Amino acid sequence: MTVMAESASDSRQLASNGDALYRFSSQALLAIVWTSSFIFGLYILANYAAAYFENDLLRWNNVLPEIYDPSQPQASIGIGLHFAAGGFILVLGGMQLIDSIRSNYPRVHHWTGRLYIFLSMVAAIGGLSFIAIKGTVGGLVMDIGFSLYGVLMFVAAVQTVRYAIARQLLNHQAWAWRLYALAIGSWLYRMDYGLWLILTDWVGHTEEFDGWFDHIMAFFFYIPNLL
Protein backbone atom coordinates (compact mmCIF):
# COMPACT_ATOMS: atom_id res chain seq x y z
CA MET A 1 0.00 0.00 0.00
CA THR A 2 2.85 2.34 0.88
CA VAL A 3 4.49 1.72 -2.50
CA MET A 4 1.21 2.36 -4.31
CA ALA A 5 0.64 5.58 -2.34
CA GLU A 6 4.14 6.79 -3.16
CA SER A 7 3.63 5.91 -6.82
CA ALA A 8 0.36 7.84 -6.92
CA SER A 9 2.03 10.81 -5.21
CA ASP A 10 4.87 10.76 -7.73
CA SER A 11 2.37 10.64 -10.60
CA ARG A 12 0.51 13.65 -9.22
CA GLN A 13 3.77 15.54 -8.80
CA LEU A 14 4.79 14.78 -12.38
CA ALA A 15 1.38 15.89 -13.64
CA SER A 16 1.63 19.09 -11.60
CA ASN A 17 5.11 19.79 -12.96
CA GLY A 18 3.88 19.10 -16.48
CA ASP A 19 0.97 21.52 -16.05
CA ALA A 20 3.30 24.20 -14.68
CA LEU A 21 5.71 23.73 -17.59
CA TYR A 22 2.83 23.91 -20.07
CA ARG A 23 1.52 27.14 -18.53
CA PHE A 24 4.97 28.69 -18.48
CA SER A 25 5.76 27.74 -22.09
CA SER A 26 2.35 28.99 -23.26
CA GLN A 27 2.82 32.32 -21.49
CA ALA A 28 6.37 32.65 -22.79
CA LEU A 29 5.26 31.95 -26.36
CA LEU A 30 2.44 34.49 -26.10
CA ALA A 31 4.87 37.06 -24.70
CA ILE A 32 7.32 36.50 -27.55
CA VAL A 33 4.58 36.70 -30.20
CA TRP A 34 3.02 39.80 -28.67
CA THR A 35 6.36 41.60 -28.24
CA SER A 36 7.46 40.81 -31.78
CA SER A 37 4.10 41.71 -33.33
CA PHE A 38 3.97 44.87 -31.15
CA ILE A 39 7.31 46.00 -32.60
CA PHE A 40 6.15 45.10 -36.11
CA GLY A 41 2.95 47.10 -35.57
CA LEU A 42 4.99 50.14 -34.55
CA TYR A 43 7.16 49.64 -37.64
CA ILE A 44 4.09 49.61 -39.90
CA LEU A 45 2.74 52.78 -38.33
CA ALA A 46 6.09 54.57 -38.47
CA ASN A 47 7.03 53.47 -41.99
CA TYR A 48 3.74 54.05 -43.80
CA ALA A 49 2.73 57.10 -41.77
CA ALA A 50 6.11 58.72 -42.43
CA ALA A 51 5.68 58.17 -46.17
CA TYR A 52 2.21 59.71 -46.00
CA PHE A 53 3.21 62.81 -44.05
CA GLU A 54 6.29 63.31 -46.24
CA ASN A 55 4.06 63.08 -49.33
CA ASP A 56 6.10 60.15 -50.64
CA LEU A 57 3.53 57.38 -50.99
CA LEU A 58 5.59 55.69 -53.70
CA ARG A 59 7.80 54.54 -50.82
CA TRP A 60 5.03 52.08 -49.95
CA ASN A 61 6.05 50.12 -53.03
CA ASN A 62 9.56 49.57 -51.66
CA VAL A 63 8.17 47.01 -49.22
CA LEU A 64 5.24 45.58 -51.19
CA PRO A 65 5.18 46.07 -54.97
CA GLU A 66 2.27 47.84 -56.68
CA ILE A 67 0.64 48.90 -53.41
CA TYR A 68 0.44 52.59 -54.32
CA ASP A 69 -0.82 53.71 -57.73
CA PRO A 70 -1.45 57.47 -58.18
CA SER A 71 -4.08 56.70 -60.83
CA GLN A 72 -6.23 54.75 -58.33
CA PRO A 73 -6.73 56.97 -55.26
CA GLN A 74 -9.65 54.91 -53.93
CA ALA A 75 -7.43 51.83 -53.74
CA SER A 76 -4.74 53.88 -52.00
CA ILE A 77 -7.26 55.05 -49.39
CA GLY A 78 -8.35 51.45 -48.80
CA ILE A 79 -4.84 50.10 -48.35
CA GLY A 80 -3.86 53.13 -46.27
CA LEU A 81 -6.71 52.42 -43.85
CA HIS A 82 -5.69 48.76 -43.83
CA PHE A 83 -2.10 49.61 -42.88
CA ALA A 84 -3.05 52.17 -40.24
CA ALA A 85 -5.68 50.00 -38.56
CA GLY A 86 -3.51 46.90 -38.92
CA GLY A 87 -0.60 48.55 -37.16
CA PHE A 88 -2.78 49.53 -34.22
CA ILE A 89 -4.39 46.10 -33.84
CA LEU A 90 -0.94 44.49 -33.70
CA VAL A 91 -0.03 46.91 -30.92
CA LEU A 92 -3.30 46.44 -29.00
CA GLY A 93 -4.01 42.77 -29.65
CA GLY A 94 -2.02 41.01 -26.95
CA MET A 95 -3.31 43.40 -24.29
CA GLN A 96 -6.83 42.05 -24.75
CA LEU A 97 -5.76 38.53 -23.83
CA ILE A 98 -3.96 39.28 -20.56
CA ASP A 99 -5.99 37.84 -17.66
CA SER A 100 -4.76 40.36 -15.10
CA ILE A 101 -5.93 43.30 -17.21
CA ARG A 102 -9.32 41.72 -17.82
CA SER A 103 -9.76 40.97 -14.10
CA ASN A 104 -8.25 44.05 -12.46
CA TYR A 105 -8.97 46.72 -15.07
CA PRO A 106 -12.23 45.71 -16.76
CA ARG A 107 -12.95 49.23 -18.05
CA VAL A 108 -9.56 49.33 -19.77
CA HIS A 109 -10.30 45.93 -21.31
CA HIS A 110 -13.77 47.01 -22.46
CA TRP A 111 -12.73 50.30 -24.04
CA THR A 112 -9.55 49.04 -25.68
CA GLY A 113 -11.59 46.03 -26.81
CA ARG A 114 -14.12 48.28 -28.53
CA LEU A 115 -11.29 50.13 -30.26
CA TYR A 116 -9.65 46.83 -31.21
CA ILE A 117 -12.86 45.49 -32.75
CA PHE A 118 -13.47 48.71 -34.67
CA LEU A 119 -9.91 48.81 -36.02
CA SER A 120 -10.10 45.12 -37.00
CA MET A 121 -13.20 45.86 -39.06
CA VAL A 122 -11.52 48.89 -40.64
CA ALA A 123 -8.45 46.80 -41.52
CA ALA A 124 -10.65 44.12 -43.09
CA ILE A 125 -12.78 46.57 -45.08
CA GLY A 126 -9.75 48.57 -46.20
CA GLY A 127 -7.95 45.48 -47.48
CA LEU A 128 -11.05 44.09 -49.18
CA SER A 129 -11.73 47.42 -50.90
CA PHE A 130 -8.16 47.51 -52.21
CA ILE A 131 -8.51 44.00 -53.65
CA ALA A 132 -11.89 44.83 -55.21
CA ILE A 133 -10.60 48.02 -56.84
CA LYS A 134 -7.05 47.13 -57.81
CA GLY A 135 -6.36 43.49 -57.04
CA THR A 136 -3.22 42.05 -55.47
CA VAL A 137 0.15 41.82 -57.16
CA GLY A 138 -0.03 38.01 -57.12
CA GLY A 139 -3.17 37.68 -59.22
CA LEU A 140 -6.23 35.48 -58.75
CA VAL A 141 -4.86 33.06 -56.14
CA MET A 142 -3.59 35.88 -53.93
CA ASP A 143 -6.85 37.79 -54.47
CA ILE A 144 -8.84 34.79 -53.22
CA GLY A 145 -6.52 34.05 -50.29
CA PHE A 146 -6.32 37.63 -49.06
CA SER A 147 -10.04 38.25 -49.59
CA LEU A 148 -10.88 35.19 -47.50
CA TYR A 149 -8.52 36.51 -44.84
CA GLY A 150 -10.33 39.86 -44.77
CA VAL A 151 -13.76 38.23 -44.60
CA LEU A 152 -12.70 35.93 -41.76
CA MET A 153 -11.25 38.84 -39.81
CA PHE A 154 -14.47 40.83 -40.18
CA VAL A 155 -16.56 37.82 -39.12
CA ALA A 156 -14.31 37.15 -36.11
CA ALA A 157 -14.61 40.80 -35.04
CA VAL A 158 -18.41 40.70 -35.30
CA GLN A 159 -18.64 37.42 -33.39
CA THR A 160 -16.30 38.64 -30.67
CA VAL A 161 -18.40 41.71 -29.92
CA ARG A 162 -21.69 39.83 -30.39
CA TYR A 163 -20.85 37.29 -27.69
CA ALA A 164 -19.50 40.03 -25.41
CA ILE A 165 -22.82 41.87 -25.63
CA ALA A 166 -24.69 38.60 -24.99
CA ARG A 167 -22.48 37.94 -21.93
CA GLN A 168 -21.50 34.55 -23.33
CA LEU A 169 -17.95 34.91 -22.08
CA LEU A 170 -16.56 31.54 -23.16
CA ASN A 171 -17.71 32.09 -26.74
CA HIS A 172 -16.49 35.69 -26.54
CA GLN A 173 -13.02 34.57 -25.47
CA ALA A 174 -12.90 31.85 -28.12
CA TRP A 175 -13.68 34.35 -30.88
CA ALA A 176 -11.29 36.91 -29.38
CA TRP A 177 -8.50 34.33 -29.70
CA ARG A 178 -9.51 33.65 -33.30
CA LEU A 179 -9.46 37.37 -34.03
CA TYR A 180 -6.00 37.70 -32.49
CA ALA A 181 -4.78 34.67 -34.46
CA LEU A 182 -5.95 36.40 -37.63
CA ALA A 183 -4.63 39.81 -36.60
CA ILE A 184 -1.06 38.52 -36.27
CA GLY A 185 -1.32 37.00 -39.75
CA SER A 186 0.41 39.99 -41.35
CA TRP A 187 3.32 39.55 -38.94
CA LEU A 188 3.47 35.80 -39.61
CA TYR A 189 3.39 36.46 -43.36
CA ARG A 190 6.64 38.42 -43.10
CA MET A 191 8.18 35.95 -40.64
CA ASP A 192 7.38 32.99 -42.90
CA TYR A 193 8.85 34.69 -45.96
CA GLY A 194 11.97 35.69 -44.01
CA LEU A 195 12.48 32.13 -42.79
CA TRP A 196 11.89 30.76 -46.29
CA LEU A 197 14.51 33.15 -47.68
CA ILE A 198 17.06 31.95 -45.13
CA LEU A 199 16.30 28.26 -45.73
CA THR A 200 15.83 28.15 -49.51
CA ASP A 201 16.95 31.45 -51.05
CA TRP A 202 13.46 32.15 -52.46
CA VAL A 203 12.64 28.77 -53.99
CA GLY A 204 9.06 28.93 -55.33
CA HIS A 205 8.86 32.73 -55.02
CA THR A 206 8.71 35.28 -57.84
CA GLU A 207 8.77 39.08 -57.91
CA GLU A 208 5.13 38.94 -59.05
CA PHE A 209 4.20 36.75 -56.06
CA ASP A 210 2.76 34.07 -58.34
CA GLY A 211 5.18 31.21 -57.65
CA TRP A 212 4.07 27.97 -56.02
CA PHE A 213 5.33 29.08 -52.60
CA ASP A 214 3.52 32.41 -52.99
CA HIS A 215 0.29 30.55 -53.74
CA ILE A 216 0.70 28.49 -50.58
CA MET A 217 1.46 31.58 -48.53
CA ALA A 218 -1.72 33.29 -49.75
CA PHE A 219 -3.54 30.95 -47.34
CA PHE A 220 -0.87 29.55 -45.01
CA PHE A 221 -0.28 32.75 -43.02
CA TYR A 222 -3.71 32.59 -41.38
CA ILE A 223 -5.50 29.25 -41.88
CA PRO A 224 -3.20 27.18 -39.59
CA ASN A 225 -3.69 29.83 -36.88
CA LEU A 226 -7.37 28.93 -36.69
CA LEU A 227 -6.90 25.16 -36.37
Question: Which sequence ranges carry the predicted segments?
Answer:
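Alpha-helical membrane insertion/targeting regions
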Residues: 2-227
